[in-house]
Curated annotation (Swiss-Prot):
Predominant subcellular localization, coarse grouping: membrane
Organism encoding this protein: Bacillus cereus (strain AH187)
Domain of life: Bacteria
Protein name: Holin-like protein CidA
Key words of the record: Cell membrane, Cytolysis, Membrane, Transmembrane, Transmembrane helix
Membrane topology: Multi-pass membrane protein
Gene: cidA
Record-linked InterPro entries: Holin-like_CidA, LrgA/CidA
Transmembrane segments: 3-23, 30-50, 58-78, 89-109
Amino acid sequence: MKWWKLSGQILLLFCFAWTGEWIAKQAHLPVPGSIIGIFLLLISLKFNLVKKEWIQDGADFLLKELILFFIPSAVAVIRYKDTLSQYGIDLILIIMISTLCVTLVTGLLTELLLKRKGSVQ
């Protein structure tokens, strides 16, 4: 019974991802469909169209098995080691700088939203 419940929850999560992909494709948006799907899920959770309990176990399972989604990346690293040896330092710098930028923007935005929320209450 647990596997049926888990499968149903994962299927529901994938439905949001597929819907986001479809919207991105139909509207020719420059945003990845998975991001649109996550946004749709957020809206559905916010307005109680989808209850947290309906997806909790499936989301937890996917997070626990997250390492499996990185295996193709590891294989690509091995496959393109010549490219990495040529551009490795550049790639590492780009990854570090972009991670720093994302972290800074996320922190500043969170701080701004918390200040705004604090002033409203």
